[in-house]
From Swiss-Prot:
Pfam families: Ribosomal_S8 (PF00410). Belongs to the universal ribosomal protein uS8 family. InterPro entries: Ribosomal_uS8 (IPR000630), Ribosomal_uS8_CS (IPR047863), Ribosomal_uS8_sf (IPR035987). One of its GO terms (molecular function) is rRNA binding. GO terms for biological process: translation. Keywords: Ribonucleoprotein, Ribosomal protein, RNA-binding, rRNA-binding. HAMAP family: Ribosomal_uS8_B (MF_01302_B). One of the primary rRNA binding proteins, it binds directly to 16S rRNA central domain where it helps coordinate assembly of the platform of the 30S subunit. GO terms for cellular component: ribonucleoprotein complex; ribosome. This is Small ribosomal subunit protein uS8. It comes from the Bacteria.
Length: 130
C-alpha cells in the first residue's frame, strides 16, 4: 500500500523523534521534503540534514534541542491532498503572532511566509511551524 501524504508522514516522524529525544530522524527522500528541510534549517528549527546517494535515497534530519527541550514546539500540516490551501501574498497566515513560520510552496520555490510576502507571491501553504 502506498503512502498518500508523504509530507504529513515527515512531520509526524519529526514530532515522534523529538518526543523520544532522538538525535536524528530518517525517512524516504523527495525533492519537496528536501526543500522543506532546507527551510527548516535556514529558520533554525533543525540543526542539519543530509540525503543519502543510494538507489532509494533517504533524508536524515538532525534535530535541534535547547535546554533539553525540542526547538520545534508544534509542526502542523495545513494543505493536504484532500483539501489544498492556496493563499495570495496578502492572505498568508502569521503563525503565533509572527513568532512562527508558515512554509509555502510558490512558483519561485519553497519559502517562508515572510519571504513570500516580501516577494509578493502566494502559493500553497504546506505547514506551520512554531
Amino acid at each position: 500500500m502506498s503512502m498518500q501524504d508523504t509530507l504529513a508522514d515527515m512531520f509526524t516522524r519529526i514530532r515522534n523523534a523529538q518526543m523520544a529525544s532522538k538525535a536524528d530522524v530518517t525517512m524516504p527522500s523527495s525533492k519537496m521534503k528536501v526543500s522543506v528541510a532546507q527551510v527548516l534549517k535556514d529558520e533554525g528549527y533543525v540543526a542539519d540534514f543530509s540525503v543519502s546517494a543510494d538507489a532509494k535515497p533517504e533524508l536524515t534530519i538532525t534535530l535541534k534541542y535547547f535546554g533539553g527541550k525540542p526547538v520545534i514546539e508544534e509542526i502542523q500540516r495545513v494543505s493536504r491532498p484532500s483539501l489544498r490551501q492556496y493563499k495570495g501574498a496578502g492572505e498568508l497566515p502569521k503563525v503565533a503572532g509572527g513568532l512562527g513560520v508558515a512554509i509555502v510552496s510558490t512558483s519561485r520555490g519553497v519559502m517562508t511566509d515572510r519571504a513570500a510576502r516580501a516577494a509578493g507571491v502566494g502559493g500553497e501553504v504546506i505547514c506551520t511551524v512554531f
